[in-house]
């Protein structure tokens, strides 16, 4: 059966080829093409370090796109992006961190897995300087991921040079809008992933709906391909000692996969995201590991009493861990349905989990 392109009249086909050639001469190869002729229709992704979140995102953070991660203070925003940086570095990629808040802890970044010796870092004085650095890094096509921490700290030069208390209406919003227009095209061409961390503010006088909003105006919301809302939902304890938090991430916007999915995972103090915790949760949901009462079993053999002991068993047996992870990934690739809308939802607490 002839395709639609074959059915085009010869004179139209000739005129079309002529104008396509002219456009490519003027603007470069790839400036315009048939969608089916694109070399890569499938968007490549970067792992977040949390298998549950990768699943909710449809594979991970998309390359060559703008991503916004927002949430309350100490919810895990920086930890999540440091894990993404570590994953890029494991693949031989180059990462940059624009530390507008001047708060990056190199010791913690190392504990998460970041190679700080090869991490590019900038601590800009103004918002204009920060975004110009981002634009130049993106246009170089030599950097694979750039993280900006945070939008709220991108203070316009006019505000810094002005007096305390001066009314500076909409300066940051205009700055972000101009930056988005400038860098978005370059991001797509270079394949660089740009992640903006953002803070929450309260809207005054809101009676209905959520009073929460993000800083920096509306531009980032429109230009971002993925928006992640991360919240701390639980404090993890062993007895009375706190050792981490449980985080919940909602995919508020996703242009490359179905949105509104939710993922949960543990963040351990001083260590970052618990990758083994994510693996145990998904192994249970996909049926690779079964749970009866407090006991977790694999192929009929008990491997741990309680979730924490099961995680320890996987940590002590790397070959077994690799087998479980392979089976989980195979089931997820085949479209296995998880038991809940929330990916990696924490199981009900058992007596063993409570005592440990």
Curated annotation (Swiss-Prot):
Alphabetized InterPro entries for the sequence: AAA+_ATPase, DNA_recomb/repair_RecA, DNA_recomb/repair_RecA_CS, P-loop_NTPase, RecA-like_C, RecA-like_N, RecA_ATP-bd, RecA_C_sf
Principal subcellular localisation of the protein: cytoplasm
Pfam families, alphabetized: RecA, RecA_C
Entry GO terms, CC: cytosol
Any GO BP: DNA recombination
Compartments where located: Cytoplasm
Residues annotated as binding ATP: 71-78
GO molecular function terms listed in the Swiss-Prot or TrEMBL record: ATP binding; ATP hydrolysis activity; ATP-dependent DNA damage sensor activity; damaged DNA binding; single-stranded DNA binding
Superkingdom of origin organism: Bacteria
Keyword list, A-Z: ATP-binding, Cytoplasm, DNA damage, DNA recombination, DNA repair, DNA-binding, Nucleotide-binding, SOS response
Family membership: Belongs to the RecA family.
PANTHER family reported for this sequence: MITOCHONDRIAL DNA REPAIR PROTEIN RECA HOMOLOG-RELATED, RECA
Described purpose of this protein according to its UniProt entry: Can catalyze the hydrolysis of ATP in the presence of single-stranded DNA, the ATP-dependent uptake of single-stranded DNA by duplex DNA, and the ATP-dependent hybridization of homologous single-stranded DNAs. It interacts with LexA causing its activation and leading to its autocatalytic cleavage.
Name this polypeptide is given: Protein RecA
Lineage of the species this protein comes from: Bacteria, Bacillati, Cyanobacteriota, Cyanophyceae, Synechococcales
């Amino acid at each position: 059966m002839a395709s639609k392109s074959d059915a085009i009249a010869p004179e139209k086909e000739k005129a079309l080829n002529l104008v396509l050639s002219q456009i490519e001469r003027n603007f470069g190869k790839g400036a315009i093409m048939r969608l089916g002729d694109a070399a890569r229709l499938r968007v490549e992704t970067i792992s977040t370090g949390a298998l549950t979140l990768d699943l909710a995102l449809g594979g991970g953070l998309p390359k060559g796109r703008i991503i916004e991660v927002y949430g309350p203070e100490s919810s895990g925003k920086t930890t999540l992006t440091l894990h993404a940086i570590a994953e890029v570095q494991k693949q031989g990629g180059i990462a940059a961190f624009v530390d507008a808040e001047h708060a990056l802890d190199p010791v913690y970044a190392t504990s998460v897995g970041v190679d700080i010796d090869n991490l590019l870092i900038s601590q800009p004085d103004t918002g204009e300087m920060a975004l110009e650095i981002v634009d130049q890094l993106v246009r170089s096509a030599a950097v694979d991921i750039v993280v900006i921490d945070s939008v709220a700290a991108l203070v316009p030069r006019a505000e810094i040079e002005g007096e305390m208390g001066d009314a500076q209406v909409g300066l940051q919003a205009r700055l972000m809008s101009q930056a988005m227009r400038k860098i978005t095209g370059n991001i797509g061409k270079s394949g660089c992933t740009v992640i903006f961390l953002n803070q929450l503010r309260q809207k005054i006088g809101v009676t209905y709906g959520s009073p929460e909003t993000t800083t920096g105006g509306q531009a980032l919301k429109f230009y971002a391909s993925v928006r992640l809302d991360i919240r701390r939902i639980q404090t993890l304890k062993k007895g009375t000692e706190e050792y981490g938090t449980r985080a919940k991430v909602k995919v508020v916007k996703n242009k490359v996969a179905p949105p509104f999915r939710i993922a949960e995972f543990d963040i351990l103090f001083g260590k970052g995201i618990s990758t083994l915790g994510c693996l145990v949760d998904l192994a249970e949901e996909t049926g690779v590991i079964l749970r009866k009462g407090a006991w977790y079993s694999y192929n009929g053999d008990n491997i741990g009493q309680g979730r924490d002991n099961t995680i320890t068993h996987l940590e002590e047996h790397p070959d077994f861990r690799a087998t479980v992870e392979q089976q989980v990934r195979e089931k997820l690739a085949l479209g296995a349905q998880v038991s809940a809308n929330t990916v990696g939802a924490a199981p009900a607490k058992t007596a063993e989990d409570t005592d440990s």
